Amino acid sequence: MPLSSGKPLYFLSIPKTAGTTLYHILATYFPMDQVAPIQSLRKLIETPIGQIQRYRLIGGHYYYRVEPILGVKPVYITMFRNPVDRVISYYAHILRNPNHYAHHRVHNQTLLEFTEDQENLPLYANAQVRYLGLNRDILGVYKQLDRNSLSQNYFEQLMEGFAPNGFYDESYLECAKQRLKHFPFFGFKTWFDQSLQLLCRTFGWEIPKHYQKMMVNPNPFKSIDDKAVSNIRKQTELDHALFEHALVEFKQKYQEKVLE
């Protein structure tokens, strides 16, 4: 399906799902001046609407329902990752990055301690489902905060931790599944090459022969605590259900569009 002239492509990038790598590949299919820079949600909001509407490709950790920011309904695509692997990778990311709003609390925690600290649940509990299945009033929350709160990353913290009915409400999952029906493409970090093939077949692009993996860091853990893994599984049960649901759809699309 070629992209229509009136709708930008929006890559809803869930953290630690190979988003940076895919976005750089996506950017090669558009003129440079039509590709939005990867930036924070706050900076996207503060970008003049006239400039935003010149972009044909937009991507970042901006969640679902970005129409009020973009001024138009975009074409949504996304990537998924095994929930346990994603949480462990995100934990490692927070450890490495002192500018992350949770670093001050997490940097001295083991993975097990991280998963047992209830304050950390907003960071990762069923986060993939919450990225797709919730309606955040992004602009409304932004406008209510003063400059001091914005400068301290409080806005990002509120958006990431948004869960009006707690972290385990199955209605989030059902909503995410329904919304996914309208995504012409979604892929998986574990099957990145196959995802790239399906992406290109979906939009009529040439499949790149080579690409550079971005933001790839070696696994810093010699071993993973079994109890921590068990905790993560319980805290991401809805994510696992969405992952398995999406994988069935992905395999069917791959068979139809790539293999046949």
Predicted segments with their positions:
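A cross-family signal for N-terminal binding/gating loops and helix N-caps
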Residues: 2-44, 50-70, 79
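Short glycine/proline-rich turn/loop motifs
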Residues: 4, 175-180, 218-226
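Conserved aromatic-histidine-acidic binding/catalytic patches
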Residues: 10-14, 75, 183-191, 227-234
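A residue-level signal for conserved active-site and pocket-lining positions in enzyme catalytic cores
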Residues: 18, 82, 187, 199, ...
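Short, well-ordered alpha-helices that flank and scaffold nucleotide-derived cofactor binding pockets
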Residues: 24-28, 201, 248
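A generic structural motif
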Residues: 36-42, 87, 209-219
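PAPS-dependent sulfotransferase catalytic core
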Residues: 57-65, 207-260
